[in-house]
């Protein structure tokens, strides 16, 4: 005999069949803090239905559905994009892509699942969009001159680079714009949407907290769809709110004197996003812990300096208020970040005269040091 395989008796065969037919207890590959994975998924589903039950979006659950959506995007129009991943690390961005959220001005927001995994089988769900079809869809969008808008494009560009092989152009970033328009408030998408678009009527949904312990790519597409697609709708609405403030010539931009902010947004901030994304792609990353440490340090120094500055000029309060009322070129308290107001303070109210002939109306540190007699200018 070529192979000496032992012969099984009928009783042995029957035992094997019985063993196979037994229903084994399901042990999910994921762990959650409380209860089971399946129970947690039911809670997530219930909470999504509670908060967004009447909300309608599209689930693009096939290659053709995704491509049809892309084909129906109007030419040269705004397309809001967002990506969902299994986590926030670079590996999650490249290998753990769950799906792409999309909304064009002329269509309902939609979600295209790509990499959702069943918690039962630990295999990909059927009825998802292939990565090749995603590429084909973006080819269509690019040829139609789509203008891509994001909320935190820095993150999404890296995800899309992993899918497409290139960085898509950024037409607008609502998070960057929000920092420029008001740096002293939270800049999360849901907070900004609720405050500026819905005027506090939407509420900031907290149901995403239920995802704790379950990566988004393990959420069934039909459950995660409403949560994820809604992000692209909020991004579009926030963009439409911000656009007039950062467009020269509009009444909003003129009223709030935002022309200089427009220049910074269009010529510095937006072009910098793909540069930073490319650096991150190549392995260069900003140490956010160090950044936060420096922010805390210099915020304290700034606040201390401002307090001292306000105390010093408090004796000039009446003169400043008189000037503000009659000339309108200064305010009280004085905006120490405004060279124009500092110039008025030094040369018109303090009447210091020309301090440096080369800079007859200068407001640099050497000028301030001389005015305050804190240091001697050398040079």
Name every feature range the model reports, one short phrase each.
Residues 166-184, 189-190, 194:
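Conserved beta-strand -> loop -> alpha-helix junction used to position metal-binding or nucleic-acid-contacting
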Residues 89, 160-170:
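Substrate-recognition/cap helix-loop segment adjacent to the acidic, metal-dependent catalytic center
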Residues 1-118, 184, 196-197, 203, ...:
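Conserved "right-hand" nucleotidyltransferase catalytic core of DNA-directed polymerases
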Residues 105-148, 284:
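Nucleic-acid-processing active sites and adjacent nucleic-acid-binding tracks
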Residues 80, 145-153:
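Acidic beta-strand-to-loop metal/phosphate-binding motif
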Residues 85-87, 154-155, 176:
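Short, glycine/acidic-enriched loop or turn micro-motifs at the edges of active sites
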